[in-house]
Design a protein with these regions (language model features):
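Glycan-binding loop/region signatures in secreted carbohydrate-active enzymes
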Residues: 110-120, 267-364, 393-396
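Substrate-binding surface in catalytic domains of secreted glycosidases
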Residues: 70-84, 159-307
Length: 595
């Protein structure tokens, strides 16, 4: 790589130095392909599931919030978990190294009088620039106040409540909203994710839920999670047929970078009543609210085999849909409305995805180079299903990167003086010490908002090194990083805290007459008003004289008025105290002869 010489001035707040180094592992761990949702109503099962599969997961989406109006996002978690404050699970997830990207649903449509959803409430809010700006501000406040890594929007009412005739209008409003929210989030170094039902290539004649405008928002969003489930709801059938999901993915990657696309997988199944004989009790048992043809119940995948065994059913795998199914009969005994004993028998049909289903869907990640899969929801899966995902993740595991910084140790120990030319070098290799050449590389600094920002971009040399000459402008936490590829992970060095001292210039006289009042002036750089300047004095008798203190003006200038009453040697040193931007800074000692 041809080296480019550039001097950079960087200003940032100091953060603590991470002293541990990144080391290579003997074997590549699984590719982190799994994401998913942690609902507020199932924390006891969903959180342990997410925490126990950290080798597969890089991010999670707490399903805890709903947008109620333009100024209000309601916390659904706290009322549902009064004895388990939100700080607890957030701390666990952060300790696991997960990015936390909570989901916000559309809660604007609830009619308090009828209890039924009212169409177009959110769409109309997005039509108004002032309301749209308020929603953006409300979301930003939620993200920043909780130090989330981004936000996920799950606004399904556009698809399932609003009339089809409204979709073209909603699409325009949605795109404008996404543009404004994206700009605001990205300005803070945060991510924007959207979760939507499937869309399809318009050329096929089946556009799907096109109001979510995948092509138009592709450059604005960081992630798309496709809800490749709920294909069958009102009548028995597969939850999310593989070919149906594949068509949505094929279209998605044609309009959105595949590295942004996640395919949703269901951790649940459905159990439909297909026929009923006899007179059913008025109070059916177990999870059914009603026993009638067409009514379905939702169950967790991990209960599927138990359900089948309880009724002597044998699940069969349907290769066309890549899902399992079985049928059974269930008899309900109880009391009729008139008080007499009664019973009915319901024929039921079950569909769900199992470990084989998850394997086939996880394989789509390699086929299309997708970001991953997203489970609705963590905690519903059979353990074998995650074993299946792990097997796929291991088979497509990317190479690890060994990254290190080779720099002058004084940068992070005693520090350097402002204006001192330095250079910083990162070295990037594979675990077998093969240099990673030609990789896009970046020098980054840590901002006050906790986000890393590129300040210099380039590429690694043939020997895997990346060198940048730097003129540091203040204390800063820095690192070097190379971009990941499909076959290799992103690689970043241990953060380095660079310590910088101010420059203090002043010119006291070499000698002065005893008892004569005189003024000495100087300047602190960088120029800034209000910097505390201390003058330390030691007389020829080695006795300390009370120090003097002043502050700088807008140009960094300062002055002291002195009067050495008795002859002798007076040694002076000017200093500025340590603060967030600079370490303790001292001028050289200067001796003034007093005659």
């Amino acid at each position: 790589m041809k080296k480019r010489h550039i001097y950079l001035t960087v200003f940032a707040t100091v953060f603590s130095l991470i002293v541990s180094s990144f080391t290579a592992k003997a074997a590549n761990p699984p590719r982190k392909i799994l994401s998913g949702w942690i609902p507020y109503y199932s924390m006891k099962t969903s959180l342990p599931s997410a925490m126990s599969n950290a080798d597969l997961i890089s991010q999670v989406s707490p399903f805890w919030y709903t947008l109620k109006n333009k100024n209000t996002i309601t916390d659904l978690y706290t009322p549902a978990n009064p004895s388990f404050p939100m700080a607890g699970p957030l701390s666990q997830l952060q300790s696991a190294g997960y990015k936390i990207i909570p989901t916000i649903t559309d809660g604007t449509n609830v009619n308090l009088t009828t209890g039924k959803p009212t169409p177009l409430i959110l769409s109309n809010l997005l039509a108004d620039p002032a309301s749209r700006a308020s929603i953006v501000s409300t979301i930003i406040n939620l993200v920043m106040s909780n130090k989330f890594d981004g936000i996920d929007l799950d606004f399904e009412d556009f698809a399932y409540v609003d009339p089809i005739s409204s979709w073209p209008t909603t699409q325009v409003r949605w795109v404008q909203f996404i543009q404004e929210l994206s700009t605001a989030l990205h300005a803070q170094g945060k991510l924007l994710s959207i979760t939507t039902p499937p869309s399809f290539d318009p050329a096929t004649g089946k556009k799907g839920y096109y109001q979510y405008a995948w092509p138009q928002v592709a450059s604005m969003i960081d992630q798309l999670h496709i809800m490749a489930y709920d294909f069958s709801t009102t009548s028995p059938g597969p939850i999310g047929p593989l070919d149906w999901a594949t068509r949505a993915i094929t279209y998605a990657v044609s309009v959105i970078p595949a590295s942004k696309v996640y395919v949703g997988i269901p951790g649940y199944g459905r159990d439909w009543v297909t026929s009923v004989s006899g007179v059913c009790p008025t109070l059916p048992v177990n999870y059914e609210k009603t026993v009638a043809k067409g009514v379905s119940a939702v169950f967790a995948m991990h209960d599927a085999t138990t359900l089948a065994a309880a009724y002597g059913a044998t699940p069969t795998f349907n290769p066309q849909y890549a899902e399992s199914t079985f049928t059974y009969q269930k008899t309900y005994n109880g009391t009729a409305a008139n008080g007499s004993l009664t019973s009915c028998t319901a024929s039921r049909t079950v569909w769900y995805q199992d470990q084989q289903s998850f394997t086939l869907r996880a394989n789509l990640i390699n086929t299309y180079r997708l970001a991953g899969i997203s489970e609705w929801t963590f905690g519903m899966e059979d353990p074998l299903a995650f074993t299946a995902i792990r097997n796929v993740a291991v088979s497509i595991a990317p190479d690890q990167v060994v990254a290190s910084l080779n720099n002058d140790a004084t940068l992070s120990t005693t520090g350097i003086t402002l204006g001192t030319p330095t250079s910083i070098t990162g070295t990037f290799t594979l675990p077998d010490k093969t240099p990673i050449a030609g990789a896009p590389a970046h020098l980054q600094v840590l901002g006050v908002n906790g986000a890393w920002t590129n300040i210099f971009d380039g590429a690694t040399a043939a020997d895997g090194t990346f060198t940048v000459p730097v003129l540091w402008g203040s204390n800063v936490t820095a690192r070097m990083i190379i971009d990941g590829t499909w076959t290799r992970l992103e690689g970043d060095t241990t953060p380095l805290v660079v310590k910088v001292a101010r420059v203090i210039a002043w010119s006291p006289p070499a000698s002065i007459k005893a008892g004569l009042t005189y003024t000495v002036a100087g300047q602190v750089q960088p120029k800034a008003a209000g910097v505390t300047v201390n003058l330390g004095i030691v007389s020829s008798t080695k006795s300390s004289i009370a120090p003097m203190t002043t502050t700088t003006d807008a140009n960094g200038n300062f002055s002291f008025t002195l009067n050495n009453a008795t002859p002798g040697f007076y040694t002076y040193q000017v200093s500025t105290p340590e603060d967030a931007s600079y370490i303790l800074s001292n001028s050289p000692f200067v001796t003034v002869v007093t005659r």
